[in-house]
Amino acid sequence: MKLSALSIIFGMILVMTIMYTKAEAEAEAEADADADAKAEAEAFWGTLAKWALKAIPAAMGMKQNK
């Protein structure tokens, strides 16, 4: 009987450890995906701002020359 109870306890600990490890890995993957999405958005807006800073003065110069 004692061996059977110990086996059940060991099995429960093993399952809990696996579930915890899986949850931790999923949380880490989600955090990485969020960081990648944020970096991608920042890169997009940064590129757009650089383009606008170059295009606006050029467009204003074209209006003044006419």
From Swiss-Prot:
InterPro entries, per database record: Antimicrobial_4, Pilosulin
Top-level lineage group: Eukaryota
Record's GO cellular component terms: extracellular region; membrane; other organism cell membrane
Residue ranges listed under propeptide: 24-43
Pfam families: Antimicrobial_4, Pilosulin
Localization per record: Secreted; Target cell membrane
Sorted UniProt keywords: Antimicrobial, Membrane, Pharmaceutical, Secreted, Signal, Target cell membrane, Target membrane
Tissues with expression: Expressed by the venom gland.
GO annotation terms (biological process): defense response to other organism
Signal peptide: 1-23
Disulfide bridge partners, by residue number: none
Protein family according to the UniProt entry: Belongs to the non-disulfide-bridged peptide (NDBP) superfamily. Medium-length antimicrobial peptide (group 3) family. Ponericin-W subfamily.
Protein name according to UniProt: M-poneratoxin-Dq3a
